[in-house]
Amino acid sequence: MAVVAPRTLLLLLSGALALTQTWAGSHSMRYFSTSVSRPGRGEPRFIAVGYVDDTQFVRFDSDAASQRMEPRAPWMEQEEPEYWDRQTQISKTNAQIELESLRIALRYYNQSEDGSHTIQRMYGCDVGSDGRFLRGYQQDAYDGKDYIASNEDLRSWTAADMAAEITKRKWEAAHFAEQLRAYLEGTCVEWLRRYLENGKETLQRTDAPKTHTTHQAVSDHEATLKCWALSFYPAEITLTWQRDGEDQTQDTELVETRPAGDGTFQKWAAVVVPSGQEQRYTCHVQHEGLPKPLTLRWEPSSQPTIPIVGIIAGLVLFGAVIAGAVVAAVRWRRKSSDRKGGSYSQAASSDSAQGSDVSLTACKV
Protein backbone atom coordinates (compact mmCIF):
# COMPACT_ATOMS: atom_id res chain seq x y z
CA MET A 1 0.00 0.00 0.00
CA ALA A 2 1.73 3.10 -1.24
CA VAL A 3 0.58 5.44 1.48
CA VAL A 4 1.82 3.27 4.34
CA ALA A 5 5.53 3.14 5.10
CA PRO A 6 7.20 -0.30 5.36
CA ARG A 7 7.91 0.14 9.07
CA THR A 8 4.24 0.87 9.68
CA LEU A 9 3.32 -2.28 7.79
CA LEU A 10 5.48 -4.35 10.11
CA LEU A 11 3.70 -2.84 13.08
CA LEU A 12 0.37 -3.70 11.50
CA LEU A 13 1.17 -7.37 11.20
CA SER A 14 2.77 -7.63 14.60
CA GLY A 15 -0.44 -6.21 16.00
CA ALA A 16 -2.53 -8.67 14.06
CA LEU A 17 -0.54 -11.60 15.32
CA ALA A 18 -0.71 -10.37 18.88
CA LEU A 19 -4.46 -10.53 18.59
CA THR A 20 -4.49 -14.19 17.65
CA GLN A 21 -3.27 -15.32 21.05
CA THR A 22 -6.46 -16.68 22.60
CA TRP A 23 -6.95 -19.39 25.18
CA ALA A 24 -5.85 -22.96 24.49
CA GLY A 25 -8.41 -24.77 22.39
CA SER A 26 -10.24 -21.57 21.49
CA HIS A 27 -10.80 -20.07 18.03
CA SER A 28 -11.36 -16.55 16.77
CA MET A 29 -12.83 -14.70 13.81
CA ARG A 30 -11.61 -11.13 13.38
CA TYR A 31 -12.01 -8.42 10.82
CA PHE A 32 -9.50 -5.63 10.30
CA SER A 33 -10.14 -2.56 8.19
CA THR A 34 -8.13 0.52 7.31
CA SER A 35 -9.11 3.65 5.43
CA VAL A 36 -6.29 6.04 4.46
CA SER A 37 -6.93 9.46 2.96
CA ARG A 38 -4.65 10.68 0.18
CA PRO A 39 -5.31 14.34 -0.64
CA GLY A 40 -5.10 15.13 -4.33
CA ARG A 41 -5.19 11.45 -5.29
CA GLY A 42 -8.88 10.66 -5.09
CA GLU A 43 -10.91 8.93 -2.42
CA PRO A 44 -9.27 7.13 0.51
CA ARG A 45 -8.00 3.63 0.01
CA PHE A 46 -10.07 1.13 1.96
CA ILE A 47 -8.84 -2.35 2.77
CA ALA A 48 -10.66 -4.98 4.83
CA VAL A 49 -9.46 -8.47 5.68
CA GLY A 50 -10.94 -11.31 7.69
CA TYR A 51 -9.04 -13.88 9.74
CA VAL A 52 -10.10 -17.16 11.31
CA ASP A 53 -7.43 -17.83 13.91
CA ASP A 54 -4.14 -17.17 12.08
CA THR A 55 -5.51 -17.70 8.57
CA GLN A 56 -6.71 -14.92 6.30
CA PHE A 57 -9.89 -16.01 4.52
CA VAL A 58 -11.30 -12.89 2.79
CA ARG A 59 -9.95 -9.57 1.52
CA PHE A 60 -11.33 -6.40 -0.05
CA ASP A 61 -9.21 -3.61 -1.55
CA SER A 62 -10.88 -0.54 -3.01
CA ASP A 63 -7.87 -0.10 -5.33
CA ALA A 64 -8.09 -3.63 -6.74
CA ALA A 65 -9.26 -4.11 -10.31
CA SER A 66 -12.07 -6.44 -9.25
CA GLN A 67 -13.55 -4.09 -6.63
CA ARG A 68 -14.91 -7.20 -4.89
CA MET A 69 -14.53 -9.12 -1.66
CA GLU A 70 -12.32 -12.06 -2.60
CA PRO A 71 -11.55 -15.45 -1.04
CA ARG A 72 -8.12 -15.96 0.50
CA ALA A 73 -8.51 -19.56 1.65
CA PRO A 74 -9.38 -22.66 -0.44
CA TRP A 75 -12.30 -23.56 1.78
CA MET A 76 -13.98 -20.26 0.96
CA GLU A 77 -14.38 -21.23 -2.69
CA GLN A 78 -17.53 -23.17 -1.83
CA GLU A 79 -19.46 -20.05 -0.86
CA GLU A 80 -22.24 -19.09 -3.27
CA PRO A 81 -22.08 -16.01 -5.56
CA GLU A 82 -24.72 -14.33 -3.41
CA TYR A 83 -22.33 -14.44 -0.47
CA TRP A 84 -19.63 -12.57 -2.39
CA ASP A 85 -22.12 -10.07 -3.79
CA ARG A 86 -23.36 -9.25 -0.30
CA GLN A 87 -19.92 -8.99 1.28
CA THR A 88 -18.73 -6.81 -1.59
CA GLN A 89 -21.64 -4.45 -1.08
CA ILE A 90 -20.96 -4.25 2.65
CA SER A 91 -17.31 -3.40 2.00
CA LYS A 92 -18.19 -0.70 -0.50
CA THR A 93 -20.69 0.77 1.94
CA ASN A 94 -18.07 0.74 4.69
CA ALA A 95 -15.60 2.49 2.40
CA GLN A 96 -18.07 5.35 1.91
CA ILE A 97 -18.93 5.53 5.60
CA GLU A 98 -15.28 5.71 6.55
CA LEU A 99 -14.72 8.41 3.95
CA GLU A 100 -17.23 10.54 5.82
CA SER A 101 -15.74 9.47 9.15
CA LEU A 102 -12.36 10.79 8.04
CA ARG A 103 -13.94 14.14 7.22
CA ILE A 104 -15.72 14.25 10.56
CA ALA A 105 -12.51 13.38 12.41
CA LEU A 106 -10.75 16.32 10.78
CA ARG A 107 -13.31 18.59 12.42
CA TYR A 108 -13.05 16.85 15.77
CA TYR A 109 -9.28 17.34 15.82
CA ASN A 110 -9.26 20.70 14.03
CA GLN A 111 -7.01 19.36 11.27
CA SER A 112 -6.60 20.52 7.68
CA GLU A 113 -7.44 18.38 4.66
CA ASP A 114 -3.90 18.60 3.31
CA GLY A 115 -2.41 15.67 5.20
CA SER A 116 -3.04 11.94 5.05
CA HIS A 117 -5.04 10.42 7.90
CA THR A 118 -6.01 6.90 8.87
CA ILE A 119 -9.03 5.26 10.44
CA GLN A 120 -8.74 1.64 11.57
CA ARG A 121 -10.98 -0.95 13.17
CA MET A 122 -10.74 -4.45 14.57
CA TYR A 123 -13.74 -6.47 15.71
CA GLY A 124 -14.54 -10.11 16.21
CA CYS A 125 -15.41 -12.96 18.53
CA ASP A 126 -13.76 -15.94 20.24
CA VAL A 127 -15.30 -19.33 20.93
CA GLY A 128 -14.09 -22.10 23.22
CA SER A 129 -13.24 -25.66 22.24
CA ASP A 130 -16.94 -26.46 22.65
CA GLY A 131 -17.91 -23.78 20.11
CA ARG A 132 -19.55 -21.53 22.69
CA PHE A 133 -19.08 -17.77 22.83
CA LEU A 134 -16.16 -16.65 24.99
CA ARG A 135 -15.82 -12.95 24.26
CA GLY A 136 -16.31 -10.24 21.66
CA TYR A 137 -14.60 -6.95 20.97
CA GLN A 138 -14.43 -3.88 18.79
CA GLN A 139 -11.55 -1.42 18.88
CA ASP A 140 -10.97 1.64 16.73
CA ALA A 141 -8.07 4.00 16.08
CA TYR A 142 -7.44 7.33 14.39
CA ASP A 143 -3.99 8.11 12.98
CA GLY A 144 -2.51 5.09 14.73
CA LYS A 145 -3.72 6.01 18.20
CA ASP A 146 -6.48 4.46 20.28
CA TYR A 147 -9.81 6.16 19.69
CA ILE A 148 -12.67 4.13 21.15
CA ALA A 149 -13.20 0.52 22.19
CA SER A 150 -15.99 -1.67 23.48
CA ASN A 151 -15.65 -2.75 27.09
CA GLU A 152 -15.55 -6.39 28.07
CA ASP A 153 -19.25 -6.46 28.90
CA LEU A 154 -20.11 -5.26 25.36
CA ARG A 155 -22.55 -2.82 26.93
CA SER A 156 -20.38 0.28 27.17
CA TRP A 157 -17.45 2.08 25.55
CA THR A 158 -14.09 3.50 26.58
CA ALA A 159 -13.08 6.71 24.80
CA ALA A 160 -9.40 7.59 24.50
CA ASP A 161 -9.74 11.38 24.26
CA MET A 162 -12.21 14.25 24.11
CA ALA A 163 -12.98 13.73 20.43
CA ALA A 164 -13.80 10.09 21.08
CA GLU A 165 -16.08 11.18 23.92
CA ILE A 166 -18.28 12.82 21.28
CA THR A 167 -18.50 9.52 19.43
CA LYS A 168 -19.16 7.67 22.66
CA ARG A 169 -22.15 9.87 23.48
CA LYS A 170 -23.57 9.39 19.99
CA TRP A 171 -23.18 5.63 20.14
CA GLU A 172 -24.76 5.46 23.58
CA ALA A 173 -27.74 7.49 22.40
CA ALA A 174 -28.18 5.22 19.38
CA HIS A 175 -27.74 1.99 21.42
CA PHE A 176 -24.89 0.82 19.20
CA ALA A 177 -23.50 -1.47 21.91
CA GLU A 178 -26.68 -3.54 21.89
CA GLN A 179 -26.46 -4.03 18.14
CA LEU A 180 -22.78 -4.90 18.31
CA ARG A 181 -23.34 -7.38 21.14
CA ALA A 182 -26.14 -9.13 19.23
CA TYR A 183 -23.85 -9.51 16.22
CA LEU A 184 -20.80 -10.72 18.16
CA GLU A 185 -22.68 -13.20 20.35
CA GLY A 186 -24.86 -14.48 17.51
CA THR A 187 -23.92 -14.02 13.88
CA CYS A 188 -20.18 -13.90 14.47
CA VAL A 189 -20.21 -17.15 16.43
CA GLU A 190 -22.42 -18.90 13.87
CA TRP A 191 -20.13 -18.05 10.97
CA LEU A 192 -16.99 -18.89 12.92
CA ARG A 193 -18.35 -22.37 13.64
CA ARG A 194 -19.21 -22.77 9.97
CA TYR A 195 -15.72 -21.77 8.84
CA LEU A 196 -14.06 -24.03 11.40
CA GLU A 197 -16.01 -26.94 9.96
CA ASN A 198 -15.49 -26.04 6.29
CA GLY A 199 -11.79 -25.35 6.76
CA LYS A 200 -11.03 -27.86 9.50
CA GLU A 201 -8.18 -29.52 7.57
CA THR A 202 -6.36 -26.18 7.62
CA LEU A 203 -7.72 -24.38 10.66
CA GLN A 204 -7.67 -27.23 13.15
CA ARG A 205 -4.29 -28.70 12.18
CA THR A 206 -1.07 -28.43 14.17
CA ASP A 207 2.39 -28.25 12.58
CA ALA A 208 5.21 -28.73 15.07
CA PRO A 209 8.06 -26.20 14.83
CA LYS A 210 11.37 -27.11 13.23
CA THR A 211 13.96 -25.87 15.70
CA HIS A 212 17.70 -25.23 15.90
CA THR A 213 20.18 -22.86 17.53
CA THR A 214 22.89 -20.70 15.99
CA HIS A 215 25.98 -18.97 17.34
CA GLN A 216 27.60 -15.74 16.22
CA ALA A 217 30.57 -14.03 17.84
CA VAL A 218 29.94 -10.32 18.40
CA SER A 219 33.30 -9.54 20.04
CA ASP A 220 36.26 -11.28 21.62
CA HIS A 221 34.27 -11.59 24.82
CA GLU A 222 30.63 -12.12 23.77
CA ALA A 223 28.52 -14.16 21.38
CA THR A 224 24.88 -14.21 20.34
CA LEU A 225 22.93 -17.43 20.72
CA LYS A 226 19.77 -17.53 18.66
CA CYS A 227 16.97 -20.07 19.01
CA TRP A 228 14.92 -20.61 15.85
CA ALA A 229 11.41 -22.03 15.41
CA LEU A 230 10.25 -22.44 11.82
CA SER A 231 7.29 -23.86 9.87
CA PHE A 232 4.86 -24.08 12.79
CA TYR A 233 1.08 -23.62 13.06
CA PRO A 234 -0.87 -22.22 14.83
CA ALA A 235 1.05 -19.02 15.48
CA GLU A 236 1.10 -19.12 19.27
CA ILE A 237 4.47 -20.33 20.53
CA THR A 238 6.77 -19.72 23.49
CA LEU A 239 10.56 -19.42 23.19
CA THR A 240 12.60 -18.81 26.34
CA TRP A 241 16.30 -18.84 27.14
CA GLN A 242 17.55 -20.10 30.49
CA ARG A 243 20.95 -19.87 32.15
CA ASP A 244 21.62 -22.69 34.58
CA GLY A 245 17.86 -23.24 34.72
CA GLU A 246 16.94 -19.60 35.37
CA ASP A 247 14.86 -17.64 32.87
CA GLN A 248 16.71 -14.87 31.01
CA THR A 249 13.58 -13.00 29.93
CA GLN A 250 14.99 -9.55 30.64
CA ASP A 251 18.09 -10.21 28.54
CA THR A 252 16.33 -11.94 25.64
CA GLU A 253 15.62 -10.31 22.29
CA LEU A 254 12.35 -11.80 21.07
CA VAL A 255 10.89 -10.96 17.66
CA GLU A 256 7.20 -11.01 16.87
CA THR A 257 5.86 -14.18 15.29
CA ARG A 258 6.02 -13.81 11.50
CA PRO A 259 4.17 -15.54 8.65
CA ALA A 260 6.41 -17.66 6.45
CA GLY A 261 4.21 -17.18 3.41
CA ASP A 262 3.17 -20.83 3.18
CA GLY A 263 0.55 -20.89 5.93
CA THR A 264 3.09 -21.48 8.70
CA PHE A 265 5.00 -19.15 11.02
CA GLN A 266 8.52 -18.26 12.14
CA LYS A 267 10.04 -16.87 15.32
CA TRP A 268 13.40 -16.54 17.03
CA ALA A 269 14.78 -15.53 20.40
CA ALA A 270 18.35 -14.34 20.97
CA VAL A 271 20.55 -13.78 23.99
CA VAL A 272 24.08 -12.34 24.26
CA VAL A 273 26.33 -14.55 26.39
CA PRO A 274 29.95 -14.44 27.62
CA SER A 275 32.25 -16.35 25.29
CA GLY A 276 33.04 -19.78 26.69
CA GLN A 277 29.83 -19.99 28.72
CA GLU A 278 27.48 -20.99 25.91
CA GLN A 279 26.82 -24.44 27.37
CA ARG A 280 25.19 -22.90 30.42
CA TYR A 281 22.33 -21.66 28.23
CA THR A 282 19.34 -23.65 27.01
CA CYS A 283 16.40 -22.68 24.81
CA HIS A 284 12.95 -23.97 25.73
CA VAL A 285 10.21 -24.27 23.11
CA GLN A 286 6.52 -24.80 23.82
CA HIS A 287 3.95 -25.28 21.06
CA GLU A 288 0.64 -27.05 20.60
CA GLY A 289 2.15 -29.31 17.93
CA LEU A 290 4.84 -30.70 20.24
CA PRO A 291 4.11 -33.77 22.40
CA LYS A 292 6.22 -32.12 25.12
CA PRO A 293 8.32 -28.95 25.41
CA LEU A 294 11.71 -29.02 23.69
CA THR A 295 15.04 -28.10 25.25
CA LEU A 296 17.85 -27.05 22.90
CA ARG A 297 21.49 -26.31 23.56
CA TRP A 298 24.01 -24.96 21.07
CA GLU A 299 26.62 -27.54 20.13
CA PRO A 300 29.89 -26.12 18.71
CA SER A 301 30.46 -29.19 16.55
CA SER A 302 27.11 -28.95 14.80
CA GLN A 303 26.59 -25.29 13.91
CA PRO A 304 23.54 -25.42 11.60
CA THR A 305 23.22 -23.34 8.51
CA ILE A 306 20.59 -20.66 8.93
CA PRO A 307 18.00 -21.03 6.13
CA ILE A 308 18.58 -17.49 4.92
CA VAL A 309 16.59 -17.90 1.73
CA GLY A 310 13.58 -19.19 3.60
CA ILE A 311 13.78 -16.45 6.20
CA ILE A 312 14.14 -13.68 3.64
CA ALA A 313 11.30 -15.09 1.58
CA GLY A 314 9.18 -15.18 4.69
CA LEU A 315 9.99 -11.59 5.53
CA VAL A 316 9.21 -10.42 2.00
CA LEU A 317 5.87 -12.19 2.12
CA PHE A 318 5.44 -10.85 5.61
CA GLY A 319 5.48 -7.31 4.26
CA ALA A 320 3.20 -8.28 1.41
CA VAL A 321 0.71 -9.95 3.70
CA ILE A 322 0.61 -6.83 5.76
CA ALA A 323 0.23 -4.40 2.96
CA GLY A 324 -2.54 -6.34 1.41
CA ALA A 325 -3.87 -8.34 4.21
CA VAL A 326 -3.70 -6.26 7.20
CA VAL A 327 -3.46 -2.74 6.31
CA ALA A 328 -5.86 -2.88 9.09
CA ALA A 329 -4.39 -4.19 12.13
CA VAL A 330 -2.12 -1.66 13.79
CA ARG A 331 -2.12 -3.27 17.13
CA TRP A 332 -5.78 -2.88 17.89
CA ARG A 333 -5.72 0.63 16.63
CA ARG A 334 -9.30 1.39 16.15
CA LYS A 335 -11.17 3.32 13.57
CA SER A 336 -13.39 6.13 14.66
CA SER A 337 -16.77 5.30 13.31
CA ASP A 338 -20.02 6.51 14.67
CA ARG A 339 -22.70 7.81 12.49
CA LYS A 340 -23.13 11.52 12.81
CA GLY A 341 -26.83 11.20 12.93
CA GLY A 342 -27.33 7.80 11.44
CA SER A 343 -27.36 4.27 12.71
CA TYR A 344 -24.66 1.72 13.39
CA SER A 345 -26.47 -1.09 11.58
CA GLN A 346 -24.97 -4.54 11.31
CA ALA A 347 -23.79 -5.91 8.03
CA ALA A 348 -27.23 -6.88 6.94
CA SER A 349 -29.02 -4.52 9.26
CA SER A 350 -32.17 -6.36 10.24
CA ASP A 351 -31.34 -9.75 8.78
CA SER A 352 -27.76 -10.10 10.01
CA ALA A 353 -29.03 -11.26 13.37
CA GLN A 354 -30.35 -14.30 11.54
CA GLY A 355 -26.88 -15.22 10.34
CA SER A 356 -27.15 -13.97 6.77
CA ASP A 357 -24.06 -11.75 6.89
CA VAL A 358 -20.60 -12.30 8.26
CA SER A 359 -19.18 -8.80 8.64
CA LEU A 360 -20.50 -5.57 10.10
CA THR A 361 -21.36 -2.32 8.43
CA ALA A 362 -19.27 0.51 9.84
CA CYS A 363 -20.55 3.53 11.72
CA LYS A 364 -19.42 7.15 11.53
CA VAL A 365 -17.50 9.03 14.18
Swiss-Prot record:
The chain crosses the membrane at residues 309-332. Residues 209-295 form the Ig-like C1-type domain. Residues 299-308 are annotated as: Connecting peptide. Residues 25-114 are annotated as: Alpha-1. Gene3D superfamilies: Immunoglobulins, MHC class I-like antigen recognition-like. The modification Phosphotyrosine is found at residue 344. Belongs to the MHC class I family. This is Class I histocompatibility antigen, Gogo-A*0501 alpha chain. It comes from Gorilla gorilla gorilla.
